[in-house]
């Protein structure tokens, strides 16, 4: 079912923001999706900042452009970096340091907490003895999907990633990804020869894996691993995302580039605030 926010246009969002500005004197934080809103609500001061659901990156960018034209102060947009920064620089538009917020969460101790909650200690130790740390194994399995997404965007291939799916290419017992089968399926969806698609993939510039991996891919892949190789549960991608957000520590957020960008925006836009005045430097004991 399509969310109503996904049906908004940038112009409609700007009208909504203008009306909200008349009723709310604090900062307006314009965000892409519902999971972004849930994340930020745990890290902002509600009395000083109101998250606004935009329904996509394009709407955030469009709305911020209108704000930059001099409409009013105190509005900040935050978007996922995806495969590159926004095309037009704006002091009121920030992006994540990696592909998206999930990449930030999965690189933090929140992943360790999720593995304790949903994984099996013995199975995880056995897996890591053979294949290395779960975090590195996860990003290695997410990267082929990320490279396909990047390729599809760069060459306008129009690969339908919902139809492509994720689970058909994994051996659930070993959590092993069949990259050749994945590439062949993607080639079919974009009516290309598999050999040609492999050549295009090989020609992509180098990029850090965490910049390539899409958060929802990673959550689904982690869920597949927890089914047998890492555990005996199937929490589902949605619950895993929620658990990561809840387990994410404030002191880890304060060490991120995104946090520093927000603080810099606050300094330029006083008296508008987004974050608490002080965040503990270490996690509570």
Q: Residues of each region from the PLM?
A:
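Acidic, divalent-metal-binding catalytic cores of TOPRIM
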Residues: 1-285
């Amino acid at each position: 079912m399509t969310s109503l926010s996904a049906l908004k246009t940038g112009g409609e969002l700007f009208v909504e923001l203008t009306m909200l500005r008349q009723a709310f004197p604090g900062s307006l934080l314009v965000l892409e999706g519902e999971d972004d809103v849930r994340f930020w609500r745990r890290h902002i001061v509600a009395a000083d900042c109101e998250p606004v659901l935009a329904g996509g990156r394009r709407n955030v960018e469009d709305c911020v452009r209108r704000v930059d034209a001099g409409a009013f102060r105190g509005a900040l947009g935050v978007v996922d970096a995806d495969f590159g920064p926004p095309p037009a620089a704006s002091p009121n538009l920030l992006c994540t340091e990696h592909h998206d917020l999930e990449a930030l969460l999965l690189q933090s101790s929140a992943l360790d907490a999720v593995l304790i909650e949903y994984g099996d200690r013995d199975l995880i130790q056995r897996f890591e003895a053979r294949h290395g740390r779960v975090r590195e194994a996860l990003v290695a399995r997410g990267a082929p999907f990320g490279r396909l997404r990047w390729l599809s965007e760069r060459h306008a291939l129009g690969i339908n990633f919902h139809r492509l799916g994720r689970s058909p290419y994994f051996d659930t017992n070993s959590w092993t990804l069949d990259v050749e089968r994945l590439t062949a399926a993607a080639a079919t969806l974009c009516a290309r020869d598999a050999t040609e698609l492999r050549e295009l993939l090989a020609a992509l510039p180098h990029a850090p894996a965490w910049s390539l991996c899409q958060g929802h891919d990673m959550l689904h892949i982690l869920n597949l691993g927890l089914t047998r190789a890492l555990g005996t549960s199937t929490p589902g991608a949605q619950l895993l995302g929620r658990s990561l957000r809840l387990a994410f520590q404030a002191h880890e957020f304060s060490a991120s580039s995104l946090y520093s960008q927000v603080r810099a925006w606050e300094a330029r836009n006083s008296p508008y605030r987004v974050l608490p005045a002080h965040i503990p430097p270490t996690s509570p004991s």
